[in-house]
């Protein structure tokens, strides 16, 4: 018996109707909170190298990255290139009421959307600008240092001088024992971030595309002295 189709309606007894019903039920069970939005797709098409990925981070990646942060107590956290804010929302959800989250976003559309998302949260500060402004933004808010700095920006496309300058500012902005956490398609930054005393990486497959998650750690005690190093000579504990 042929299926009766009229105005795109499918007869309830048709096998096609049963199939679409199953698909609808399966779709309803999927968490779409981390899927690509229209805004994300448009910005990727306009700035593919800046956005770096065609889809936002998966829920699994977001949770894995957040697991690298100790949320017990007030924390100061900065994020470079939050995009749609999938990591930002998870961090804000977990951090205490006395914590601060500074979001540095170059893209005006993303920045405006982040301000809308966190309009009622005084802990979250959205900065439309370069991550290199971190020292000034901390000083402006009378914050001494960050406990954690998170980044998903594609460091591989930055010129070497800009890359090293941002790494130096990141290192200086961290408290002793603080961590710089990155998630990247490649792990090339590890060979440049020799200013950090310790680094550990993992290859995370539950994301499209798979990502390297690397945690760079600043030494717990440095006797209060600034540490500028010869980039090509500084040792780093490289654990895969």
Question: Residue spans of the language-model regions?
Answer:
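A short glycine-rich, Lys/Arg-flanked "PGG" loop and its adjoining helix->strand segment in the class I
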Residues: 164-176
């Amino acid at each position: 018996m042929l299926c009766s189709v009229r105005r795109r309606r499918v007869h309830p007894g048709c096998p096609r109707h049963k199939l679409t019903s199953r698909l609808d039920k399966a779709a309803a069970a999927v968490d779409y909170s981390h899927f690509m939005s229209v805004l994300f797709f448009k910005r990727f098409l306009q700035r593919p190298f800046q956005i770096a990925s065609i889809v936002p981070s998966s829920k699994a990646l977001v949770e894995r990255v957040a697991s690298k942060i100790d949320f017990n107590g007030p924390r100061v956290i900065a994020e470079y290139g939050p995009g749609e804010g999938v990591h930002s929302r998870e961090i804000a959800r977990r951090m205490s009421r006395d914590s601060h989250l500074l979001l540095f976003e170059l893209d005006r559309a993303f920045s405006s959307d982040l301000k809308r998302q966190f309009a009622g949260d005084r802990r979250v500060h959205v900065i439309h600008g370069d991550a290199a402004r971190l020292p000034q933004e901390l000083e402006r808010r009378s914050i001494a240092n960050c406990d954690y700095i998170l980044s998903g920006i594609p460091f591989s496309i930055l010129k070497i001088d800009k890359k090293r300058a941002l790494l130096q500012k990141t290192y200086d902005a961290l408290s002793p024992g603080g961590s710089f956490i990155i998630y990247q398609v490649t792990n090339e930054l590890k060979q440049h971030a020799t200013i950090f005393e310790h680094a550990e990486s993992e290859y995370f497959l539950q994301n499209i595309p798979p990502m390297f998650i690397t945690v760079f750690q600043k030494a717990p005690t440095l006797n209060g002295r600034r540490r500028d190093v010869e980039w090509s000579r500084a040792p780093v504990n490289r654990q895969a």
